[in-house]
Amino acid sequence: LQQSSAASDVYKRQKINISEKDRIAAYTPNQIETVECFLGASAIGSIWSSCSPDFGVPGVIERFSQIKPKLLVITDKYYYNGKEINIIERLPAILKKIKKIKSVLILNYPGKKLRKLNKIKNIKIYYYSEIGKLEISRNKLKKFDFDHELAILYSSGTTGKPKCICHRSGGVLLQHLKEHQLHCNIKPNDNVFYFTT
């Protein structure tokens, strides 16, 4: 929770200039830092969108170019079947096609050495590993409407260009309540493995 607060604080105050209704695109694997960034985004009312790192550059551009994000959250690498996959080398191609991105927040893959990035013209680069060193403001969380946009996800793109699907705060909460409590009967201290593509 503290890191989520730090993330939302960084979005607002630390020159990234992200505010309510702004879009944040994430090109990251499922790691705790991704969740912290998502919670930080939702705390200030910005709209989260994400693509799996196994998407190639064209798949990412097809999706994120539709939403015009101000900030791209990206991990430096991920691992598949024991092999290291470098994602950060894809960044220049993404930035070349999505001109609205003004800032990049780089997450380090847990337990691995961070790949630092060379400066990119007209793009501000931030490192998530430095967020914890910032002094965090203790503002009260703002309440948003049931209908407030929370996240934009995408159709598969099998029948043409992927289509944006906007998920609203209230609907996401109701869906999780329904799935977790009614469908799956999840109780405190239960372990859950939820596999999806």
Where are these regions (language model features)?
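Structural core segment of the AMP-binding/adenylate-forming
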Residues: 15-16, 43-129
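Conserved pre-ATP/AMP-binding loop-to-beta segment of ANL
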Residues: 105-106, 118-154, 161, 171-176, ...
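AMP-binding/adenylate-forming
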Residues: 46-49, 55, 64-76, 150-153, ...
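Conserved AMP-binding/adenylate-forming
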Residues: 12-61, 191-197
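Conserved acidic residues
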Residues: 22, 70, 102, 147, ...
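Single conserved hydrophobic/aromatic residue that forms the stacking wall/gate
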Residues: 1-7, 11
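Short internal alpha-helix immediately C-terminal to a glycine-rich phosphate-binding loop
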Residues: 9-17, 178-185
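Alpha-helix termination/capping residues and helix-transition junctions
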Residues: 4, 15-18, 66, 97-98, ...
